[in-house]
């Protein structure tokens, strides 16, 4: 037969064969979280959840031993100082490269201002409300600052999630603001909300400054500088503005140690996350701190949680779900060789 002749069995050069199908990949090779998704997950699990314990534990230490906010800030800053050993082992300068040292100090100063305002607010305002105001203001300010200074826009889903977080903030804090007591108590409560708001603004600006720092040991350097700046500022202020108090019982010491460790973990995770994802989205995901703080406020501090608090926390969780689902993308790791 003609088809059996070698001439007819040769491939037709005028009609090239279709390209071969790409090799099949395992499920863990086909799909992996993007950088933005990884950053948001780290912010959610490592930044927001541990930070939710900090406010209630700080309030417990204050109720048990009347521990002032500046002293609690000093104890927390002490947990940052051992990072100097890591920098020395790596051969990195403790204060960062000389050309960006001033920005690193400014970032550390903003972090300390944010933390100090948060610790002061949680002593006069319920822990959940203080966390809500701080995270809500940081979310809004991060979105505005990043849009104006970095020209980094957000998608429609991201804006929907941000607006949802703000709505949750209004639902939680709104009823409390309308029922402020007259006199000294009402003034202190209003000042507590103002401190929480200013703490959120300082946090958003600090995250933006941190994103502008580009050197290998950026995170440990800023963490060490935050502890150093916090000690230099809060130790003199403690003796001038407040009265030093030594924790008197095991509960107070346990709260102080837990606050220092959990706050350092949250600080590290947020610093990593903000280099991977939009600062406004990171701040929005950190609203998980509000949910944890409200739960601990009810079960540990035995403080009343209003229905509006539960509703606002639900709205915030739904907004976090929208942002996370929007950024939950997959990247193919295998490339077909041509």
Swiss-Prot record:
Q: Where is this region: Disordered?
A: 1-24
Query: One GO cellular component from the entry?
Result: membrane
Instruction: Alphabetically list the UniProt keywords.
Output: Membrane, Repeat, Transmembrane, Transmembrane helix
TM ranges are: 37-57, 67-87, 105-125, 160-180, 190-210, 221-241, 250-270, 281-301, 305-325
Location of the protein in the cell: Membrane
What membrane topology is annotated for this entry? Multi-pass membrane protein
Q: List residues of the EamA domain.
A: 49-174, 272-325
InterPro entries linked to this entry: EamA_dom
Recorded family membership: Belongs to the SLC35G solute transporter family.
Quote the protein name from its UniProt record: Solute carrier family 35 member G3
Its taxonomic path starts at:
Eukaryota, Metazoa, Chordata, Craniata, Vertebrata
């Amino acid at each position: 037969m003609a088809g059996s002749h070698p001439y007819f069995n040769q491939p037709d050069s005028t009609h090239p064969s279709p390209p071969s199908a790409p090799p099949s990949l395992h499920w863990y090779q086909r799909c992996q979280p993007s950088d933005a998704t990884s950053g948001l997950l780290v912010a959610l699990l490592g930044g927001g959840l541990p930070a939710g314990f900090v406010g209630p534990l700080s309030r417990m230490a204050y109720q048990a031993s009347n521990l002032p906010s500046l002293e609690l800030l000093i104890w927390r800053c002490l947990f940052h100082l051992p990072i100097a050993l890591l920098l020395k082992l790596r051969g990195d300068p403790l204060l960062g490269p000389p050309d960006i040292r001033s920005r690193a100090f400014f970032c550390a100063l903003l972090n300390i201002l944010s933390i100090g305002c948060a610790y002061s607010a949680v002593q006069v305002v319920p822990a959940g409300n203080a966390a809500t105001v701080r995270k809500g203001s940081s979310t809004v300010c991060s979105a505005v600052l990043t849009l104006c200074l970095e020209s980094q826009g957000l998608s429609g889903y991201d804006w929907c999630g941000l607006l949802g977080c703000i709505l949750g903030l209004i639902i939680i804090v709104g009823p409390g603001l309308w029922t402020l007591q007259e006199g000294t108590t009402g003034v202190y409560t209003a000042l507590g909300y103002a401190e929480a708001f200013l703490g959120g603004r300082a946090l958003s600006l600090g995250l933006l400054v941190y994103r502008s720092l580009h050197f290998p040991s950026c995170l440990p350097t800023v963490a060490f500088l935050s502890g150093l700046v916090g000690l230099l500022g809060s130790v003199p202020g403690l003796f001038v503005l407040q009265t030093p108090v030594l924790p008197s019982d095991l509960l107070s010491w346990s709260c102080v140690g837990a606050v220092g460790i959990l706050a350092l973990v949250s600080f590290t995770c947020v610093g990593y996350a903000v280099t991977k994802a939009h600062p406004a989205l990171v701040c929005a995901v950190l609203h998980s701190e509000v949910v944890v703080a409200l739960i601990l406020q009810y079960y540990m501090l035995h403080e009343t949680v209003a229905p509006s608090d539960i509703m606002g926390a639900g709205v915030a969780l739904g907004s976090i779900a929208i942002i996370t689902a929007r950024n939950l993308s997959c990247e193919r790791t295998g490339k077909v060789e041509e």
